[in-house]
Amino acid sequence: IVNPVSGKADASGLLVPRIIQAAAQQHLNYQILLTEKPGHGVELAQRQAEQEGPVRLYACGGDGTLNEVLRGAYGHANAQVACVPCGSGNDFVRNFGGSAPFLNLEDLIQGEAVPMDLIETDQGIAVAICSAGLDAQVAYGIPKFRRIPLCGGSMAYKLSILQAVSGPLGHRLRICADDEIITGDFLMLALCNGSTYGGGFLAAPHACMNDGFLELILVRKIGRLQIARLIGDYQKGLHMQGDQV
């Protein structure tokens, strides 16, 4: 399942010839399906997963494409999901050493499936991190900046951060976690199955995607002058040492 508009290049033009070559070498029975609109990956994955017999779905795109394919495959025991990262952030594969192993299609085809945790929410299945607050505002702003020429990948994230910190900061939250109620004014909240998001921000350095646990990261409301340092620490995974986290 290929998202042709993932990242800054035409993923279908780059990937499809490689997929055909790798699949032919492995003598696979396969289909190449291109997404045509947001959410189409869910529909395509679900349609394939509902057919009889085992199926492995390769999400070829960014983290958004992977999320759609997982949502479509979720609940079907016959379906496996793999990832071919060609998006702008590719944070999912950072949990497993980066993009390089996942771009070796021959090894990926031969690889064995392993169990992985997902996050179940009232909006459906999530893969790595669910967030609210400043980081969520940043995520909403990213598509606008990606449309600017030469503004892909981490640059779009950084420009969206600048826009978000120029507006109102902080939210009053009431959180129930492990039978404990937490109330306060927070800059952001991240519920983490994986360790990174936002193009490499290391939100939960110790998060593991197959240990059965979620890590809850809370950042208290702080002033704008402190945010620059927080963002630097957050990107490196050093924010857990601060008093406001």
Where are these regions (language model features)?
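Glycine-rich beta-strand-to-loop/alpha-helix junction loops that act as flexible
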Residues: 4, 60-62, 84-86
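ATP/nucleoside-binding phosphotransfer catalytic cores, i.e., glycine-rich phosphate-binding loops
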Residues: 12, 177-183, 208, 218-245
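Gly/Ser/Thr-rich active-site loops/lids in small-molecule metabolic enzymes
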Residues: 146-156, 199-200, 205-225
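Short Gly/Thr/Asp-enriched flexible loops that form oxyanion-binding sites at enzyme active sites
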Residues: 65-77
